[in-house]
Amino acid sequence: MEILWFIPTHGDARYLGSESDGRTADHLYFKQVAQAADRLGYTGVLLPTGRSCEDPWLTASALAGETKDLKFLVAVRPGLMQPSLAARMTSTLDRISDGRLLINVVAGGDPYELAGDGLFISHDERYEATDEFLTVWRRLLQGETVSYEGKHIKVENSNLLFPPQQEPHPPIYFGGSSQAGIEAAAKHTDVYLTWGEPPEQVKEKIERVKKQAAKEGRSVRFGIRLHVIARETEQEAWEAAERLISHLDDDTIAKAQAALSRYDSSGQQRMAVLHQGDRTKLEISPNLWAGIGLVRGGAGTALVGDPQTIADRIAEYQALGIESFIFSGYPHLEEAYYFAELVFPLLPFENDRTRKLQNKRGEAVGNTYFVKEKNA
């Protein structure tokens, strides 16, 4: 089992849709979140990509030197990056981070943003380009000299002089809910990622991916992307969820949904169907809440509850075959602590850092003793 957190390079806040409660999203804050995740024992962090985010490669490069064990899940963008350049970037960051790089393959889902970036190909063509990109990229990182000509990519005698630290290359994470996305992922990914859908939908998707991977003579692992709101009691958790969207008005939700409706991403369309823009029907499965998706693209659902309930819901996803969990919460610094301190002890997730986390003492009582020592 691995658990990753999230670096909010697109901004952070205590409330969605509120300017007054926003938090300055700069390198100092990113460093605070990354170092907290490193100290608490998270496996790694996801860095988002797109025009609303700081560049993930530069951000990860800056944070690698500020952390010790934390891994960085960073996006390659087929169609926007050439595979030879991406291979050099991958190899360099993997070496300077001492083998702590993970690769997130993002084909893109917003035609308007992609047009602004100079990419004018259809949804299915993006996955064709992704397949070609990863074919070349993987071969380069494995030390081959590559000549390749496809529909979207052509290289001649391309090679990589400095290999990555991880062999044969940093692990690949890849999500795509359409048939074209699943076919590309099945050929290349190490970990197939799904958005936080209800368990029955996740089960169906896992079966589709397994069958497609088997056709390629491969097996893949599975991961899920979710938000989380963990509190000591169910009531506190649901109150926190309601507070998070308490500043959202109907006009803001309508504008956000209109913007998200232009996406041609099957995954985004599946997220939108879960809540249909209706803030009165947000618990779409036990303890799975779609409130964040009212105004946020991509990951739009959260696990909400007390520690044991959240651990039980995670176990349900594990039983389906999910091994990698990528979480986030608003604001990201505080929620990293809430989740780690409350839920980690209930999960089959342990490393040297989580063991230190559990070997904790509170403030000295009466300048005389620590509570843990008294109760020992």
From Swiss-Prot:
GO terms for biological process: alkanesulfonate catabolic process. Induction: Repressed by sulfate or cysteine. Gene3D superfamilies: Luciferase-like domain. CDD domains: Alkanesulfonate_monoxygenase. Its EC number is 1.14.14.5. It is an enzyme of class 1 (oxidoreductase). NCBIfam families: alk_sulf_monoox, PRK00719.1. Belongs to the SsuD family. Catalyzes the desulfonation of aliphatic sulfonates. This is Alkanesulfonate monooxygenase. The lineage of its organism: Bacteria, Bacillati, Bacillota, Bacilli, Bacillales.
